[in-house]
Structures are given as C-alpha cells and as structure tokens.
A protein has these predicted regions:
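Conserved beta-strand-loop-alpha-helix junction that forms the acyl-donor binding cleft
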Residues: 115-129, 133-134, 141-144
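Conserved acetyl-CoA pyrophosphate-binding loop and the N-cap/start of the following alpha-helix
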Residues: 93-105
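Conserved acetyl-CoA binding element of GNAT-fold acetyltransferases
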Residues: 78-91, 116-119, 138-141
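Conserved beta-strand in the GNAT
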Residues: 55-57, 63-72, 83, 88
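Helix-loop element at the rim of GNAT/NAT acetyltransferase active sites that forms part
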Residues: 18-37
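Short glycine/proline-enriched coil/turn segments at helix->beta-strand junctions
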Residues: 1-2, 61, 108-114, 136-137
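Active-site rim helix/loop that mediates acceptor-substrate recognition in acyltransferases
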Residues: 33-55
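Conserved N-terminal entry element of GNAT/NAT acetyltransferase domains
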Residues: 1-23
C-alpha cells in the first residue's frame, strides 16, 4: 500500500483531484457519510493554511483503496488537536487490513491527540478500539 499526503503545504493533487476524493468518500462511507458538498468543505479546511489538517490516500497498484481526512482543531489546550473526520475503505477491499494501515498512517502523520465520532453500529468502532481509542465522553447535541 502506497500513501499520498495532501495538506496546506502540498496543495491539491493532480493525480487525486478534490472531486475524486469527495466522490470516493461519498460512495464508500455509505450510510455513515455526508454529502459531497460537506466533504468538500472538510477538504477546503485541510487546504486552508490558517486551519489545516491532513488527507491521506492509500493506493494499491495506483487504485484508491482508502482515504482518511483529519482536521486540525486549533484547540489543543482543551480538546484534542486533531479530529478524524472521514475514513473510508473501498467496499471491495474491506477485510484486508487496509483500514488498520491507513489509521496507523493517520495517527503517525499528526502531532497531538486525535478525536473521532463513530456511530455505535459502525463496524469500524472495533478497529478504533484496537488502536487505542477510548470512549471518554457521551456526546450530546442540541439540534436547532
């Protein structure tokens, strides 16, 4: 598995344009995903030098196997410095260890702690726990 890193320093990738990234994530996140417009906003955040983060694209034989996006929160003193916003593995490539490899790259690619949100019925929850993520808080939201 090879990895391509995209961030504010590298800028966008000719090989993996934003539209390719948004479409891949939208397709492979399935019921756990967001609209392509919202995914694009997350990419824009990564590419903004005043905000930041990291996009990591995992490939095998030049085909995208998985993508992870982390945003820098800028709030390291009171919440984790990074939030893992999206991770998706190609439906046909699941169960081969690519998710674990991509998560390990994501963890090692950023400084500081990482938070993520995962739905209780998401199969990826077990992987996150194996990698050391814990459920420290119950998140509550007021939808207005």
């Amino acid at each position: 598995m090879n990895f391509t890193y995209i961030n504010a320093s590298t800028g966008t990738s000719e090989k993996f344009p934003n539209k390719t990234i948004t479409h891949f994530l939208h397709t492979h996140l399935e019921e756990f995903g967001d609209t392509e417009e919202d995914i694009q906003k997350c990419i824009d955040y990564v590419l903004n030098p005043n905000k930041g983060g990291q996009i990591i694209i995992g490939t095998n034989e030049d085909k995208i196997v998985g993508i992870v996006i982390l945003n820098n929160t800028g709030m390291k003193d009171y919440i984790p410095e990074n939030i893992l916003v999206y991770i998706a593995i190609n439906n046909s490539q699941r169960g081969k260890g690519y998710g674990k490899k991509l998560m390990e790259k994501a963890i090692s690619s950023v400084d500081g702690n990482i938070a993520l949100h995962v739905e209780p019925n998401n199969p990826a929850k077990a992987l996150y726990e194996k990698l050391g993520f814990t459920n420290k808080y119950l998140e509550m939201r007021l939808i207005k």
